[in-house]
Amino acid sequence: MDMIPQLMEGSSAYGGVTNLNIISNNSSSVTGATGGEATQPLSSSSSPSANSSRYENQKRRDWNTFGQYLRNHRPPLSLSRCSGAHVLEFLRYLDQFGKTKVHTNICHFYGHPNPPAPCPCPLRQAWGSLDALIGRLRAAFEENGGKPETNPFGARAVRLYLREVRDMQSKARGVSYEKKKRKRPLPSSSTSSSSAVASHQQFQMLPGTSSTTQLKFEK
């Protein structure tokens, strides 16, 4: 596996795929392939329509760039023949454009979130950028006529790879990608009795729903 990025860097088959917009850290995407928040959110002043438009534009650029990658592949690959293995090949290729320092286990700064001095450790694509990228490409594949069951971006091998990258970078950089659970405030004594009565009168609702929410079956 370690030989693949080196082989691809020196191969003319991939020389044309250098569109760095595909992994922009300023993307508006908030949901990645693993369902986590993979990129920085937009400011609160941004409207939902602007957020959606920015996400759609980024997704379109990602899709076009991946199509270029397939055309530059030797031999050229059609989308119908693209598999999870080709997606992994693509992700490893992108590492040469990374800007995130990932310390090796022999580095003195391994596990240090704020190293006090530079080191020769390699630059890689951040897990959050890769996760968001796969999330966008997975959606674009199905929007362009692909079937969910044949979606190479949702392959088990891709999910496992992203998980390995997340765990490895978390340890190497000394950062945590786990979501912090919000502590719910304890109910006061005046409201505890009324909430107890209400719980017998209606079913427990999911957070963010109301009593008027209707169930919908997904086709």
UniProtKB/Swiss-Prot annotation:
One of the record's GO cellular component terms: nucleus
Subcellular location: Nucleus
Observed phenotype of the null mutant: No phenotype, probably due to redundant function of paralogs.
Motif annotated as Nuclear localization signal, chain positions: 179-183
Pfam families named among the record's database cross-references: ALOG_dom
UniProt feature coiled coil, ranges: none
Listed Low complexity bias regions: 43-53, 188-199
InterPro entries: ALOG, ALOG_dom
Membrane-spanning parts: none
Tissue-specificity statement: Expressed around apical meristems, at the boundaries of vegetative and reproductive organs. Induced by NAC054/CUC1 and NAC098/CUC2 in shoot organ boundary cells.
A GO biological-process term: maintenance of shoot apical meristem identity
Keyword field contains Iron: no
MF-aspect GO terms: DNA binding
Keyword Transcription regulation among record annotations: yes
Region described as Disordered: spans on this chain: 31-58, 172-219
Keywords of the record: Developmental protein, DNA-binding, Nucleus, Transcription, Transcription regulation
Polar residues composition-biased segments: 200-219
Stretches assigned to the ALOG domain: 54-181
Family: Belongs to the plant homeotic and developmental regulators ALOG protein family.
Function of the molecule: Probable transcription regulator that acts as a developmental regulator by promoting cell growth in response to light. Required for the maintenance of the shoot apical meristem and for the formation of lateral organs. Promotes petal formation and growth, but may suppress organ differentiation in the boundary region.
Protein name (Swiss-Prot/TrEMBL): Protein LIGHT-DEPENDENT SHORT HYPOCOTYLS 3
Gene behind the chain: LSH3
